[in-house]
Amino acid sequence: MIFYTLEHILTHISFSLVSIGITIFLITLSVDEIIGLYDSSEKGVIGTFLCITGLLVTRWAYSGHFPLSNLYESLLFLSWSFAIIHMFPYLKKQKSYVRTITSSSTIFTQGLVTSGLLSEMQQSEILVPALQSQWLMMHVSMMVLGYAALLCGSLLSVALLVITFRKARKIFSKKKAFLKDSFSFVEIQYRNEPSNVLLSTSFISSKNYYRAQLIQQLDRWSSRIISLGFIFLTIGILSGAVWANEAWGSYWNWDPKETWAFITWTMFAIYLHTRTNPNFQSVNSAIVAFLGFIIIWICYFGVNLLGIGLHSYGSFNLH
């Protein structure tokens, strides 16, 4: 009972901390001068990380096994993984838009954990025979770490696509306006006000420069994080195959979870392949990452909703 109460308290504290942290961080994005607020948001995420760590340790202590046996526990570990990724730029003393993605992802997963959707899984139970193995920690932790990194990298690619397509729309609308003005007498006004034209041109050039810098930063960070996630995912799939051979006598059975894990791995392998070709980098690779983002959620949530296959012990029902 004590462990359950402690877990309940830590869950809600972590959710409150990350909620306050992301609110402060969003304020600092618009007001860069408030350094104190920025430090407070980072300390809030560190506090969230410590609370989730305490949650996992508490659950491990009273359950007797590493807490990765169902969707509720894997969501806790997913939040913990997002918090770790969030702290990398902070430890390097870099201001990065990665933290906007990771903090938002943490609050989303913690929101699911604290909601009543997974209440039937909050009570720890004895592991089914198939999960009573040392491979549980190795396989599931690598898979969830891989999911966390791939989701963060994919969201950065989505942000890149949004900025790029907004820029393309503005360029298209400006071309239409230019063609329309070419047949009018607007150029007379420009001759009378050359200084305004120069100021406007300088402002647009500066804005385009910072937008290009942002796109480049998003592209670089998404590539790095997805590469890291792909390594974790590969290790997770390989360790799962070895575990499956020990438990079921076959390395691969093509059940829904395994099939979608393979599809996820293939999609991000295609992403990494597009990164080797300069003609397919940035926007094209970001589109592949966006498709991979959708596939991850199908693999992680969609298959669990089905509740079929060899991995059905991690499924849940919506009431």
UniProtKB/Swiss-Prot annotation:
Signal peptide from the UniProt entry = none
Recite the UniProt keywords alphabetically.
Answer: Chloroplast, Cytochrome c-type biogenesis, Membrane, Plastid, Thylakoid, Transmembrane, Transmembrane helix
Indicate how the chain sits in the lipid bilayer.
Multi-pass membrane protein
Q: Which GO terms describe its biological process?
A: cytochrome complex assembly
- Compartments (UniProt record): Plastid, Chloroplast thylakoid membrane
> Which domain of life does the protein's organism represent?
Eukaryota
Query: Which GO CC terms are listed, alphabetically?
Result: chloroplast thylakoid membrane; plasma membrane
Q: Single GO molecular-function term?
A: heme binding
Q: Does the keyword DNA repair apply?
A: no
InterPro entries according to UniProt: Cyt_c_assembly (IPR002541), Cyt_c_biogenesis_CcsA (IPR017562), Cyt_c_biogenesis_CcsA/CcmC (IPR045062)
Note whether Transmembrane helix occurs among the keywords. yes
Where are the membrane-spanning stretches? 9-29, 44-64, 71-91, 143-163, 225-245, 259-273, 286-306
Q: Which Pfam families match?
A: Cytochrom_C_asm (PF01578)
The record's comment on protein family reads: Belongs to the CcmF/CycK/Ccl1/NrfE/CcsA family.
Q: Which NCBIfam families match?
A: cytochr_II_ccsB
In UniProt terms, what function does this protein have? Required during biogenesis of c-type cytochromes (cytochrome c6 and cytochrome f) at the step of heme attachment.
Which HAMAP family does UniProt cross-reference here?
Answer: CytC_CcsA
How it assembles, according to the record, is: May interact with Ccs1.
What name is this protein filed under? Cytochrome c biogenesis protein CcsA
Q: Which organism is the protein's source?
A: Oenothera parviflora (Small-flowered evening primrose)
